[in-house]
């Protein structure tokens, strides 16, 4: 039985073949209609045959049917290293992205971002920090005005007349309600702004009452009166047209959110 054709050993002069290829030869496959088993796989193509391959440089291969099978290089016009792609191997560096390939004299970057990702410089946030500090300073000033020592006109004095260990105190206890600070928004309703006047009225009423009541009883009576007057003021505020309108708008918003 004859030996298979693909197992027949052929002596090929590889140094001569590669030398011919590096000079100006083109590696050709055997035509589909011819099978030269004893010829050299490297053939020299005439110059007229390579006339139509102007854009393909040396080292190309033409396969069966005259089609180009590979392209080892592209002819470049002009001299110098400008515009050529340089491949640098990241020796001794780990976790390097493919961004080490650069054009020209560009420096390699260690960034994990791709080359097409827009890189912007660090923005100056000092203006934002100053604005935040100014806002905090204003809020601190408002809180300070809200808890600062009130003027004598804003004081509402409640004479407690509570003896301590059988002796009167040198200084009377006073309940202080500071006035509304300018430019500071209070979270409570405007009805509580009349607490100052309410406390004054209760103090005047207590002076005319009997002194037989204990201090605890007087305190409880004062708390009940203040609570009663404040609730009356709140009810009056709720009965105003603006309050009714606000309540209706609130209900409408609640119903619309449930749709």
Curated annotation (Swiss-Prot):
<dbReference type="GO" id="GO:0006952">
    <property type="term" value="P:defense response"/>
</dbReference>
<dbReference type="GO" id="GO:0010224">
    <property type="term" value="P:response to UV-B"/>
</dbReference>
<keyword id="KW-0132">Cell division</keyword>
<dbReference type="GO" id="GO:0009561">
    <property type="term" value="P:megagametogenesis"/>
</dbReference>
<keyword id="KW-0217">Developmental protein</keyword>
<comment type="function">
    <text>Negative regulator of the anaphase-promoting complex/cyclosome (APC/C) ubiquitin ligase required for proper mitotic progression and cell fate determination; inhibits premature cell differentiation. Prevents DNA endoreplication by promoting the maintenance of the mitotic state by preferentially inhibiting APC/C(FZR) and triggering cyclins accumulation (e.g. CYCB1-1, CYCB1-2 and CYCA2-3) in a temporal manner. Required for megagametophyte and endosperm development. Counteracts the activity of CCS52A1 thus inhibiting the turnover of CYCA2-3. Confers immunity to bacterial pathogens (e.g.</text>
</comment>
<feature type="region of interest" description="Disordered">
    <location>
        <begin position="236"/>
        <end position="259"/>
    </location>
</feature>
<keyword id="KW-0131">Cell cycle</keyword>
<dbReference type="GO" id="GO:0042023">
    <property type="term" value="P:DNA endoreduplication"/>
</dbReference>
<dbReference type="GO" id="GO:0051301">
    <property type="term" value="P:cell division"/>
</dbReference>
<dbReference type="GO" id="GO:0005634">
    <property type="term" value="C:nucleus"/>
</dbReference>
<comment type="subunit">
    <text>Interacts with APC/C activators such as APC5, FZR2, FZR3, CDC20.1 and CDC20.5.</text>
</comment>
<keyword id="KW-0235">DNA replication</keyword>
<dbReference type="GO" id="GO:0051783">
    <property type="term" value="P:regulation of nuclear division"/>
</dbReference>
<dbReference type="GO" id="GO:0009960">
    <property type="term" value="P:endosperm development"/>
</dbReference>
<keyword id="KW-0539">Nucleus</keyword>
<dbReference type="GO" id="GO:1900426">
    <property type="term" value="P:positive regulation of defense response to bacterium"/>
</dbReference>
<dbReference type="GO" id="GO:0010091">
    <property type="term" value="P:trichome branching"/>
</dbReference>
<dbReference type="GO" id="GO:1904667">
    <property type="term" value="P:negative regulation of ubiquitin protein ligase activity"/>
</dbReference>
<keyword id="KW-0611">Plant defense</keyword>
<dbReference type="InterPro" id="IPR034590">
    <property type="entry name" value="POLYCHOME/GIG1"/>
</dbReference>
<keyword id="KW-0498">Mitosis</keyword>
<protein>
    <recommendedName>
        <fullName>Protein POLYCHOME</fullName>
    </recommendedName>
</protein>
